[in-house]
Amino acid sequence: MAGRGGMVEWEVGRRRDSEDVIVLSPGPPARRRPPPVKAVEPESGGFAYEPPEKLFYKTRVCETFVTSGRCMFEDGCTFAHGDEELRPSLTACAGGWRKPSPSLSAAAPPVAVAPTPPPAQVVHELLARGSGSGGGGHRAITKVCFEFRDKGICYFGETCAFPHVSAAEIRQGSRLSSMSSSSWEMPARRSVAVTVPRTFVSVPPVAPPPPPPHYRVNNSSSYNAASMAAAAPAASDANLVAQQPPPEQGGRKMTRLEMLSLKKMTGIYGDWLEGYEHP
């Protein structure tokens, strides 16, 4: 009885283990926020700030979110998705980390920014710089940013190693480089110009038809002269057959294949002599 009761209890426990299974579905990931910046009081006076865990967290705008309107990282992206998520950047100083003072930034004189030259002038300067430096700037000159040329945007921005020039500006820059290269020439090579691929290539003119073959007749052989005389009317007959309208055979017009076979059979035996018998 004890053994049987133990077996029943084991079966009940086994059934309970197989039926009462609780599956917990993973919930949405918790949004992590940067730790608050702690203010400390240094020995020299004033207030300094300890650097947070992520120093540049949300200090720049996400370029992917700006261009496409969405980001695959969503809330976990380290860049700001909009101006409302931008955080003030921290600057390093001798006493520690501190936020830029608004009074200092307002009192600082504005920095004069040089006017941006037109794209064609930029390409012209790059071409001249690369040609004057020998082979050092050959890679940066002969290659442009394909993403900016084809799509009009580059994810690297100002840090891209290749110039951001469109297709129309490349053509204008190549014309400027060809004009400038004619004035002076390097001893080793001319200035390298940006090559523009051509989609259409000029088709060469159609070659004229070949002249008719010239037969060389040997006077010492009467057979060659007779064979050439017989071949001439046979060739003329073949041309006449080709120029004539398609004949009818059995109440129907002959196909082109039948006409070609007839023409071929006519020209095969054109060099045979009349009355000549094979020995």
From Swiss-Prot:
Q: Where are the zinc fingers (C3H1-type)?
A: 56-84, 139-167
Query: Which keywords are on file for this protein?
Result: DNA-binding, Metal-binding, Repeat, Zinc, Zinc-finger
Name a Pfam family for this protein: zf-CCCH
- Superkingdom per UniProt: Eukaryota
Q: Which GO terms describe its molecular function?
A: DNA binding; mRNA binding; zinc ion binding
Write down the PROSITE patterns for this protein, in alphabetical order: ZF_C3H1
Q: Show the InterPro entries listed in the entry.
A: ZFP36-like (IPR045877), Znf_CCCH (IPR000571), Znf_CCCH_sf (IPR036855)
Annotated region (Disordered), positions in chain: 20-45
Which SMART domains does the record cross-reference, listed alphabetically? ZnF_C3H1
Tell me what this protein is called.
Answer: Zinc finger CCCH domain-containing protein 1
